[in-house]
C-alpha cells in the first residue's frame, strides 16, 4: 500500500513510538534487494558459513525481501543499544584514531583493557544479561500493531528472519559496514542490536551514512584466529563466535589455543574499534552482567548438571549452546589458561557422560600438564 499521502505524520509517529519503546534509532529504507546479495551467495559457495546450513536454506529469501513479504515497500530498521558502561578495548592511539578519520582531540579518555580475569572466562557482551530476542520482540509487536491500524502488513525480525539485516540497516543510514563486517555507528560504535519491520506501507527512505573507517585495520589486526581474511570478509569457520556458539561438534584442535579464555562468543574485533570510544550507556539494565554469572570461575561451570545449567542461564542467550556446548568451551579455556588447581574438576569432566565434554576435558588436562612440566 502506498502510504505517501499523509505518510509524513505516520512516519513521525513511528519514530516517536520507537523511541518511547527504547530504540536508539529508527530509520527507513526501500525494500530492495540487499547490496551484498551476490557476495553472500559467493560466501556460501566457498563454504565459509561452516555448519550454519540454515543460511543456505533461506538464501533466496535473504536476497529478495519480496519473497519474505510480497508487496513489501519499506524496511523499518531499528537499533537498540546494549552497552553497559564498561570501558571498551585497549587504549586507542592517536595514530589509530587519525587512520579511522577520528580527531584525537575529540576522543574521550576512557579506554581500558576489558579482558576478564583469566580464571573467570569471557562471555561476549551481548550475552551478559537477558536474551535480547524476547525483550525486543515485545517492542516490535507494539510497532506492528500500530502499522496494522494504518492498514499495513508486516514481518518483524530480531536477527532471526531471512534478511541480510546489515545491508538494510546500512541502506537506512543506521550505520556503515566496518571491515570486520559489523555495522558501525558514530554514536553507538558497534554495541547495538538490529531489528527490522518489513512492511507493505511505503515511506520515504533515509539517506545512507558515509563510511568512516578510513585506513584503520584495528579490527582485522585484533582477530585472534585471523577470521577476518580481508576487509569486509569473514571466514566463519575460524571465528571464535562461530566456534563457541554455532559449531555443535568438536572445536578444531589447531584453533583451540587461539580461543584463550573465551567461553561464549568474542568481542575482540569490536573492542578494537576506535568508534566504540563514543559508545553511550544503555538505559536498559536487562543486558547487564548477571551477578551469579559474574561470580563464576571457569572450573565452577564444570560442576553444572543439566538442571543447574538451565537455572543459571534461564532467559539468557548462553542457553543456546546447551550444557554440552558451554562446558566444551570451558574445557578449552581451562586448557589455555588453567592451572594444576583446575585438574580435579577437569578429571571429573573427562568422565562426563557427554563425549564432547569428555574429549575437550582430556585435551585441557594434557595442556595444563605440559605447562606444569615445562
Can you name each region flagged by the protein language model?
Residues 312-338:
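C-terminal accessory/binding modules appended to enzymatic or scaffolding proteins
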Residues 1-92, 110-212, 251, 260:
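Auxiliary alpha/beta "docking" domains used to position bulky ligands
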Residues 300-305, 312-317, 345-353:
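Alpha-solenoid HEAT/Armadillo-like helical repeat scaffolds in large eukaryotic proteins
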Residues 327-337, 359-370:
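Structural detector for internal amphipathic alpha-helices that build alpha-solenoid repeat scaffolds
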Residues 23, 218-242, 262-286, 345:
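Iron-sulfur cluster-binding cysteine motifs and their immediate structural context
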Residues 42, 76, 189-198, 228-256, ...:
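Non-heme iron-sulfur electron-transfer modules
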Residues 310-312, 339-350, 370-374:
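Amphipathic alpha-helical scaffolding segments comprising HEAT/armadillo-like alpha-solenoid repeats
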Residues 323, 353-354:
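Short inter-helical turns and helix N-cap capping residues of alpha-solenoid HEAT/ARM repeat scaffolds
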Amino acid at each position: 500500500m502506498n502510504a505517501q499521502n499523509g505518510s509524513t505524520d505516520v512516519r513521525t509517529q513511528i519514530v516517536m513510538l520507537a523511541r518511547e519503546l527504547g530504540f536508539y534509532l529508527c530509520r527507513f529504507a526501500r525494500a530492495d534487494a540487499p547490496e551484498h546479495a551476490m557476495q553472500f551467495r559467493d560466501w556460501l559457495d566457498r563454504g565459509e558459513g561452516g555448519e550454519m546450513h540454515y543460511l543456505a536454506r533461506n538464501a533466496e529469501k535473504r536476497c529478495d525481501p519480496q519473497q519474505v513479504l510480497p508487496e513489501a515497500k519499506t524496511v523499518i530498521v531499528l537499533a537498540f543499544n546494549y552497552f553497559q558502561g564498561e570501558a571498551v578495548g585497549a587504549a586507542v592511539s592517536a595514530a589509530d584514531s587519525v587512520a579511522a578519520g577520528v580527531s584525537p582531540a575529540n576522543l574521550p579518555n576512557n579506554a581500558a583493557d576489558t579482558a576478564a580475569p583469566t580464571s573467570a572466562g569471557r562471555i561476549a557482551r551481548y550475552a551478559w544479561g537477558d536474551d535480547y530476542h524476547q525483550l525486543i520482540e515485545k517492542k516490535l509487536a507494539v510497532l506492528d500493531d500500530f502499522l496494522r491500524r494504518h492498514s499495513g502488513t508486516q514481518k518483524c525480525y530480531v536477527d532471526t528472519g531471512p534478511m541480510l539485516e546489515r545491508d538494510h540497516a546500512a541502506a537506512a543510514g543506521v550505520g556503515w559496514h566496518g571491515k570486520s563486517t559489523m555495522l558501525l555507528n558514530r554514536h553507538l560504535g558497534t554495541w547495538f542490536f538490529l531489528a527490522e519491520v518489513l512492511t507493505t506501507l511505503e515511506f520515504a527512505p533515509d539517506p545512507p551514512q558515509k563510511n568512516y573507517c578510513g585506513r584503520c585495520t584495528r579490527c582485522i589486526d585484533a582477530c585472534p584466529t585471523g577470521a577476518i581474511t580481508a576487509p569486509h570478509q569473514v571466514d566463519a569457520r575460524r571465528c571464535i563466535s562461530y566456534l563457541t556458539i554455532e559449531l555443535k561438534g568438536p572445536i578444531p584442535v589447531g584453533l583451540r589455543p587461539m580461543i584463550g579464555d573465551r567461553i561464549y562468543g568474542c568481542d575482540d574485533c569490536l573492542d578494537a574499534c576506535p568508534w566504540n570510544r563514543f559508545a553511550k550507556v544503555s538505559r536498559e539494565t536487562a543486558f547487564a552482567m548477571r551477578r551469579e554469572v559474574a561470580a563464576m570461575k571457569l572450573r565452577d561451570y564444570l560442576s553444572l548438571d543439566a538442571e543447574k545449567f538451565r537455572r543459571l542461564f534461564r532467559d539468557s542467550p548462553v542457553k543456546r549452546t546447551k550444557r554440552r556446548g558451554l562446558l566444551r568451551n570451558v574445557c578449552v579455556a581451562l586448557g589455555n589458561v588453567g592451572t594444576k588447581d583446575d585438574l580435579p574438576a577437569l578429571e571429573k569432566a573427562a568422565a562426563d557422560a557427554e563425549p564432547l565434554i569428555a574429549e575437550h576435558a582430556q585435551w585441557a588436562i594434557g595442556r595444563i600438564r605440559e605447562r606444569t612440566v615445562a
